[in-house]
Amino acid sequence: MSLEDHKKSIEDFGFTILNGVFSYEELQSITEALELVDKNKETSRVSSDLFAVRQFLKEIPSVVPLVFSTKLNSIINQLFGDNYFVVKSIFFDKPEKSNWYVSYHQDLTISVDRKNEALGFGPWTVKQNQFGVQPPLSILENMFTIRIHLDDTTSENGALYV
């Protein structure tokens, strides 16, 4: 599919899947950076069936240039333009035998650095000392999510239903 086809898929269905954005070596570099994470920090959640890091890009700044590669930045620019910024970053590693269940839901909150009451924003939450708020629909309608799988993902083992 061309990027124009992907853009049409987003317009028609609300999502698209782009394969091959990262090389094996690039994915390995991201994985290696993850291995250096301090799992005792408040933004990390570690159990027998889950490893998660909230504020992922803030907690592991070495992954920023790895994730936002020239190729990914070019794709984002062509699909959405250049007027964008990150509002949330979370890493999940959920092993195959994990029984951690998350029901169908929509992520509607953005992360912000402080609580500042503004018309149309709310309700507010705080998770691991990070404020979150649901923005107005006009903002939500202009947001996009990038999901990067570091391992092989198929329709049988994929973690996202759209």
Can you annotate each of these PLM segments?
Residues 2-13, 22-162:
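Non-heme Fe(II) oxygenase catalytic core, chiefly the N-lobe of the double-stranded beta-helix
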